[in-house]
Amino acid sequence: MATYLIGDLHGCYDEFQMLLERVRFDPAQDTLYLTGDLLARGDNSLACLRLVKSLGNAARTVLANHDLHFISTALGVKKIKPRDRVDAIFAAEDFFELVNWLRCQPLLIHNPAQNFVLVHAGISPDWDLTAAKVCANEVENVLRHGNYRYLVENMYAEQPDRWSPHLQGLDRLRYSINVLTRMRFCYLDHRLDFACKLSIKDAPKALAPWFALDNPLYQTGNIVFGHWASLVDETTPPNIYGLDTGCVWGNRLTMLRWEDKQYFTQSAVKKSNAF
C-alpha cells in the first residue's frame, strides 16, 4: 500500500505506463497523485486522460493551466494552440464525458494524514493553508456547479497580480487561478510575474521563486507541485517538491513514492515535435 506522486504528463502516455509498471502500481491498494497538465503537447493526451479517469479513487489529479485551456477550447472560448495535440480528444466518443470529468477536478489537494499539499503551480506567498483551501474551493465550486462558462471566458488576465483579502468576484477567482496554475516567480513585494519561465539561476534578480518568499507555510508544510520544467536538477527547499522534469521536452518523467521519498524516473521515449 503506497502513495505515489507524479509530475506533468502532457500526453506522455508511454512513459507514464512504464513508470506505473516499474513500481507495480496496484489501484486496489495504492494511490496516485498527479500534478496536472495531463494533456496537450505529447503524443497521446487522450490515453492519459482515459487512464487517469479509469483509475477512479486510486488516482487524484489537480487542475493545471493546460487543462483549463483545453476546457476553454472545448467551450469554443479559445482556439486550439498549434502545438497542442488534442485532436484525438475532440474526435473521441467520450469527449463530453472527459471534459466534464476534467472540469470537476480540484485545484488543491490537502492530505493531512501524510502531511502534503498538492497544487499545479504553487501557493500564494500571502496565503496560509486555510486561505489556499478556501480560494481553491471557490474556483472549484464555479467550475463544477456554477456558470463555469462565464468564468472560463473571463479567467485570462494578469490582473490582479497581488493578493488582498478584499478581492471579490472575478478578480478573486482570477487571482486564485493564476496562483494555483500559472505562478513561477514573484516580485519581492509578492506581485506575480507571468513572463519569466527561466531557471532560478537565470532569472532577473528582481524576481524570486514563489517558495523562496517569506511565508511560514513554505517552511512548515510539504508542498508538491509541477508546472516548472526549467527547475529540473535545481535544488529546492527540502519540503518543496517540484516534480515536472520536462518529459515532453525530451527529458524525463518523475514519480515520487511518498512513504520513503524514493524517486523513480523514466527518460522520454522521444521529444515531442510540438516544441
UniProtKB/Swiss-Prot annotation:
Question: Secretion signal: which residues?
Answer: none
- EC number(s) per UniProt? 3.6.1.41
Entry superkingdom: Bacteria
Asked if the Swiss-Prot or TrEMBL record annotates the protein with the keyword Hydrolase, the reply is yes
InterPro entries tied to this protein: ApaH, Calcineurin-like_PHP_ApaH, Metallo-depent_PP-like
**Single annotated GO MF:** bis(5'-nucleosyl)-tetraphosphatase (symmetrical) activity
Q: Print the keywords alphabetically.
A: Hydrolase
Q: What class of enzyme is it?
A: hydrolase
Asked if the Swiss-Prot or TrEMBL record annotates the protein with the keyword Hydrolase, the reply is: yes
- Catalysed reaction per UniProt? P(1),P(4)-bis(5'-adenosyl) tetraphosphate + H2O = 2 ADP + 2 H(+)
HAMAP family assigned to the protein according to its UniProt record, in alphabetical order: ApaH (MF_00199)
What this chain does, per the entry, is described as:
Hydrolyzes diadenosine 5',5'''-P1,P4-tetraphosphate to yield ADP.
The cross-references to NCBIfam families, in alphabetical order and at most eight, read: apaH, PRK00166.1
Q: Give the family per the record.
A: Belongs to the Ap4A hydrolase family.
| Name of the protein this chain belongs to | Bis(5'-nucleosyl)-tetraphosphatase, symmetrical
